[in-house]
């Protein structure tokens, strides 16, 4: 006999619930046959990955918890290439939700508005490191959507979203030469800090975001207050060392549950474009 019970879950703070089944041989998540969870440490905080929980019709999907920040990433691809284009049609959307910070839209329609400037910049920040790793001759539409479900001020949802995206693409059947990961680096009182919290970000002399693979750095975004070159280089290298650990973690997840990459129709590439 199966008994359905609603147990409190922390995904949405006190308001989150998850359906569980009690069976004679113990409880099981009968609603989620492919449910898996993975855990690791990231810059001194626990990072938890959940897969097989939602969006089973997408090519790849996951939830990533970093502190109390929760981001869901979904990636889908068209089965056939788009006709009449000479570029890779990738779209990346970072969607903020007011309920992630405990608010409800106060407009007349009570609905979310257009993307904020921060959301647009975050979408571009995630696009830059992942786009070059797709096959240059692929023309299938690929859509990445990151949805912020909960926000912890001390744990960046932007970095969490980048990692969630890398995991979703890695475990999907979409061809990709990843994984990558990202990290935020600060400089507080002369000390390099990885993924600084809210208080540290308020007084940091360096606001650095690094994305990279196990072998190399693929994206740097930075703002600083007269930081010396050797300190900047040290911050980048220390950030990359932490990135390597997360990349290895993602590779392990991919080895366990990753799908076989599909074959795509190769489109001609104008190689003269790369020599100009």
Pin down the residues of each PLM region:
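Intrinsic disorder/low-complexity segments
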Residues: 3-6
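Short, Lys/Arg-enriched N-terminal segments with co-localized hydrophobic residues
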Residues: 13-30
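Short, Gly/Pro- and small/polar-rich lid/capping loops
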Residues: 31-56, 61-62
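Glycine-rich, flexible beta-strand/loop modules in the N-terminal catalytic cores of phosphate-handling
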Residues: 46, 58-142, 148-150, 155, ...
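Gly/Lys-enriched N-terminal cap/neck module of very large, oligomeric protein machines
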Residues: 52, 57-61, 143, 178-182, ...
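Stable alpha-helical structural segments in soluble proteins, enriched in small hydrophobic residues
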Residues: 129, 160-172, 235, 242
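Mobile "lid/hinge" segments at catalytic clefts and subdomain interfaces of large enzymes
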Residues: 173-276
């Amino acid at each position: 006999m199966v008994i359905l019970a609603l147990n409190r879950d922390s995904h949405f703070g006190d308001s989150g619930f998850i359906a569980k089944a009690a069976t004679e041989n113990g409880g099981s998540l009968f609603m989620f046959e492919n449910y898996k969870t993975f855990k690791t440490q990231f810059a001194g905080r626990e990072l938890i990955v959940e897969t097989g929980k939602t969006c089973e019709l997408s090519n790849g999907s996951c939830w990533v918890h970093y502190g109390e920040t929760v981001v869901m990433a979904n990636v889908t691809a068209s089965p056939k290439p788009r006709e009449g284009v000479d570029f890779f049609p990738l779209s990346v959307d970072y969607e903020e939700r007011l309920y992630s910070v405990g608010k409800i839209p106060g407009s007349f329609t009570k609905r979310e508005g257009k993307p904020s400037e921060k959301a647009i910049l975050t979408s571009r920040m995630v696009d830059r490191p992942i786009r070059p790793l797709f096959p240059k001759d692929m023309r299938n539409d690929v859509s990445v959507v990151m949805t912020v479900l909960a926000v912890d001020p001390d744990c960046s949802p932007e970095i969490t979203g980048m990692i969630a995206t890398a995991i979703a693409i890695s475990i999907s059947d979409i061809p990709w030469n990843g994984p990558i990961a990202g990290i935020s680096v600060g400089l507080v009182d002369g000390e390099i800090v990885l993924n600084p919290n809210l208080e540290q970000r308020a007084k940091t002399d360096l606001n650095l975001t690094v994305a990279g693979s196990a072998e190399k750095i693929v994206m740097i975004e930075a703002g600083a207050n007269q930081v010396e070159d050797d300190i900047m280089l040290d911050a980048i290298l220390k950030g990359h060392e932490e990135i390597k650990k997360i990349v290895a973690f993602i590779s392990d997840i991919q080895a366990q549950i990753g799908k076989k990459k599909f074959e795509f129709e190769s489109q001609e590439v104008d190689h003269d474009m790369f020599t100009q």
